[in-house]
Each structure stands twice: as C-alpha cells, then as structure tokens.
Amino acid sequence: MGPVMLDVASYELDAEEREILKHPLVGGLILFSRNFHDAEQLRELVRQIRAASHERLVVAVDQEGGRVQRFRDGFTRLPAAQSFAAINDAATAAQLAQEAGWLMAAEMMAMDIDISFAPVLDIGHVSAAIGERSFHSDPQQARIMAECFIRGMHSAGMKTTGKHFPGHGAVTADSHKETPHDNRPLAEIRTHDMVIFRELIQRKLLDAIMPAHVIYTEADARPASGSAYWLQEILRQELGFEGIIFSDDLSMEGAAIMGSYAERGQASLDAGCDMILVCNNRQGAVSVLDNLSPIKADQLTRLYHSGQFDRQTLMASSRWQQANKALTALSERWDAHKQTLGQ
C-alpha cells in the first residue's frame, strides 16, 4: 500500500481513474459531495473503487456534521460540533455526542467507507475555516465532548482522526485560501490548543492525526503539516503518538509555501506524515505519483473499518431511529439559534 490518498471526479470511475488507482503509491481515496447522488450510487462507486485497486484502499470522507457533511440526502443530518455545548444538561450533551459519533460511523460503514476525518479538536470559533466545527472554546469542555464522540465512533468500529494539530482554532485566516500564521507564544499554544491532543493521546483514543496547514511562527517557518519539529519532535517523541499522521489536502493554499505538488508531497512525508492527501487537482496528483520516492505505507491497514452494518437493517433499528430523531432536532435548533444571531 502506498502513502498517497487521491480523489475522483464524479459518480463513477472513468478509465483514467481506474488506471491511477492501480498505481503502487496510491493507498487511499477520499470522497466529496460531487461523488454523491444517492446512497445506492455511492455504494456502487465504493465497490468500483475496491475492484479497481490492487490492494484494499482506505476510503475516506469528511462527514463531521454541520457545514462539513459530504453526504446529506438519505443520511442523518448531523449537528455541528459546537451545537452540543448549547445543550443545557451536560449528561444529555455527552450522550448525544456519543450517539452522533456512533451513528455517523455506522452510516458510513454501511457504505463500506473506512473513515471519516473526525473529530475536529481545534479550540475556539474565530477561525473562518473552523468556526462551528469546534466543540468548544474551553479546552476541557472540548475534550469532554470530543471524547464522547470518539467513543461512539469506536463502538461502531471506525478509527478516529483528530485534527488539526497542534490547533487551528486561533487564526482567522482560512488555510484553504492562504497560509495562516499563528504568532502566539509557543507556551500558549501548548497549554491552550495542544492539551486536547495530549490528553486524548494519553487515553489511546486517537488512531490518526491530521496536522494544520498553519505556520506557528515561534516554532518553525514551515506549516505544521510539513514540519519535522511538530510531527516528529512534538507529536511522536514528546506526546508519544503511535498512530497514523495524515497531511491535510496539499492542494490547499496553506500548503503552497512548500513548493510544487511533488515538493509538497515529499516535504510532508519527510517531515513525518504517513499518508498525504492530494485532491481537487488531477495534474497535481499525477505529478506527485510520477515524482515521489517509492515508499510503502502498510501501517495504514490499521484504519480499515471493523463494523458490519447493512443499511436497511441499521435504519430499521430502534437505536438508529432514536439517534436520528434527536440529532436532526438538535441540528434544527442550532440552525434556528444561528439565524437569531444573524449567522
């Protein structure tokens, strides 16, 4: 299995995509909204992906909830992470967060999708890229809700990906459009943003981590996603993380400072990433495959899902029906709340 995760253009594979998926450097594929028409079509697309590749790829999606939910029609409307903090009763909030993690994972695994890149562990809501994707502005409250969501995912059989290390929540710039700089003292990042990663790693709850395309100016001139300081010295050595490290999408503007697509990919792998994402630019992805040093990433097989869910059986279950009703209601209340704030 190779270290590159790619995307595909539409509802089904074309001939070029079938050939690309056979490349020895390809180890994963991420799906987007453009790949989804309905549940039956999605399941068939995943089947095509499995059939086209020599090895079982890690199939992924961003199905966080709120504004980042790639598959909507026919799937539960998942609430934004921040909405759980608006529930007055802490026990109810914790239970619902756990059910959200379970339900999201179960619905994805019924499509034979291995992972959703979740949860978001960024602290605070000022970032344009993060906002309501963050559970809370208080690190301990965020950790409590994230841990519940994670336990739900794990109970269903899906591995977790904490993002965006060491924390994207304090920068207003959107790394999809530019390279954000976080100029805060390193001590503040460590005690405010990084503590949630530290605690969840200590509890063995994170299977993978995705670093941020953010430059933390007191630490390194490179974004964390291409920084050996953050990925090896801090994440591996200091925090003792033994799971998978993903780059964020290298087509994002936040990664452009690292050079061409091939240079971005090599820099991220050299810095300590196990798998790199190259999406939304076919030419860039092919350039990475043509120029990357040969490398195996067999540790990625740890991310295969272990849940066995039939979609019809799942949706007929009382647990799914109760969770679906409660989570849909929370989503609607949260949207109404945002409207009163003019958001």
Curated annotation (Swiss-Prot):
Superkingdom of this protein's organism: Bacteria
Catalysed reactions, semicolon-separated: Hydrolysis of terminal non-reducing N-acetyl-D-hexosamine residues in N-acetyl-beta-D-hexosaminides
One Pfam family per UniProt: Glyco_hydro_3
Entry's EC annotation: 3.2.1.52
Catalytic site: H176 (proton donor/acceptor), D248 (nucleophile)
Keywords from the UniProt entry: Cell cycle, Cell division, Cell shape, Cell wall biogenesis/degradation, Cytoplasm, Glycosidase, Hydrolase, Peptidoglycan synthesis
Binding site for substrate: D62, R70, R133, K163, H164
PROSITE patterns named among the record's database cross-references: GLYCOSYL_HYDROL_F3
GO molecular function: beta-N-acetylhexosaminidase activity
Record-linked InterPro entries: Beta_hexosaminidase_bac, Glyco_hydro_3_AS, Glyco_hydro_3_N, Glyco_hydro_3_N_sf, Glycoside_hydrolase_SF, NagZ_Beta-hexosaminidase
EC class (word): hydrolase
Pathway(s) it belongs to: Cell wall biogenesis; peptidoglycan recycling
SUPFAM superfamilies listed in its UniProt record: (Trans)glycosidases
CC terms in the record's Gene Ontology section: cytoplasm
Localization (cell): Cytoplasm
Positions of the record's site feature: Important for catalytic activity: D174
One GO BP: regulation of cell shape
Similarity comment text for this entry: Belongs to the glycosyl hydrolase 3 family. NagZ subfamily.
Function of the molecule: Plays a role in peptidoglycan recycling by cleaving the terminal beta-1,4-linked N-acetylglucosamine (GlcNAc) from peptide-linked peptidoglycan fragments, giving rise to free GlcNAc, anhydro-N-acetylmuramic acid and anhydro-N-acetylmuramic acid-linked peptides.
Designated name of the protein: Beta-hexosaminidase
Source organism: Yersinia pseudotuberculosis serotype O:1b (strain IP 31758)
